[in-house]
Amino acid sequence: MFFWYQNHVIAKLLVWLLFPFSLVFWFISVIRRRLFRLNWLKSYRSPVPVLIVGNLSVGGNGKTPATIWLVKQFQSRGIKVGVISRGYGSRAEHYPYLVKIDDNPTRSGDEPLLIAQRTGVPVCISPNRQQAIELLLAQFNCDLIISDDGLQHYKLQRDFEIVVIDGERVFGNGFVMPAGPLRELPNRLAEVDLIINNGKLTGYSNTLMLLLPKFAVNLVSGEKKLLRDFQRIPLNAIAGIGYPQRFFNMLRDFALTLEKTQSFQDHQDFDAAHFAYFSSNQPLFMTEKDAVKCRPFAQANWWYVPVEADIQGEEVERFMQVVSQQIKEKK
């Protein structure tokens, strides 16, 4: 919500109006996690290691690029990875559901489809993570399961936890939902195995993730152009991600001129009517996540900008070694 990251009078008023509900949310979350720890609520232990990539705050922190980077790193070490996801926004005919690289994003969800297309590993979506893991293990010889999101899904036991922090917004006003963006308080970070800062260091760790765009890809023809080729052309841009402004800022950092921008909600279901606001004579830029949903009605001057995550720091290399060693010992 807009006021989570603002400090004006109306934002402060909304925080205090919602603060009692945040206390209830926090209390229920603490009790629920305690019940799982005491085994009063049952949880599932996978026969192969499980790595959670999650966050403490809601939306737009960079989990999916981090997940793709991690998958590729483990692949380069000869580790067979399977990815599970709740599949937010998906409308599959059944669950668990194995995502195909040419899937309909309405069926698979945008982020699971993007992970499958960028990595080639098996991706399974289901609200029931246990069923997703069991299907992956039944059909693929996975050494490691990576869960895209699910840090607070304590019904699934985990061997490793990674938290991705938005280096620009961090934790907003510091309150838990609904008064603030947090699902859990920052003291939870003391328990995780690795903290990744997206874009800027936050002081919570020295591991930095940079999202690096190299070119724009045409949705219709597949043609690739360097971003600098668009520097003298007025552009339009849309983003249906957790933090759209990050995408717009990235384009402006490459000296691109954005004449019109439009933010949509995360996981937006697009159709051609959403783009009536924009001139068909000007190039329209979007994220790769949005592009997987817009191809069926794309116009010839629509482009998406894929980004490659680059995660730096000694902590991440030590983490990769620890995970690889545990997998080796379990084989």
UniProtKB/Swiss-Prot annotation:
Keywords: ATP-binding, Kinase, Lipid A biosynthesis, Lipid biosynthesis, Lipid metabolism, Nucleotide-binding, Transferase
Binding site for ATP: S57, V58, G59, G60, N61, G62, K63, T64
Catalytic activity, reaction form: a lipid A disaccharide + ATP = a lipid IVA + ADP + H(+)
Coiled coil residues, start to end: none
GO molecular function, one term: ATP binding
Top-rank lineage group of the source organism: Bacteria
Enzyme Commission identifier(s): 2.7.1.130
Pfam hit, one: LpxK
PANTHER family: TETRAACYLDISACCHARIDE 4'-KINASE, TETRAACYLDISACCHARIDE 4'-KINASE, MITOCHONDRIAL-RELATED
Protein name: Tetraacyldisaccharide 4'-kinase
